[in-house]
């Protein structure tokens, strides 16, 4: 399975960004249970929209799934709003 993605520091407004295995599908889960998916670029970077409802102390999680269907363990980031 791929390594867990890295989530850059998260705030209440800016897009949520990070790095993962290039070409892997990153699934970001917001505190309210909704998700966003994006494919990491050739340099491994990825970005999803900020939902706009994050508050200080919320936790955002992300997993990476490689083209073979193997999913990483979760990475977490605590919102610093």
Give the residues covered by each predicted segment.
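Ser/Thr-rich low-complexity repeats and stalk/linker segments
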Residues: 1-81
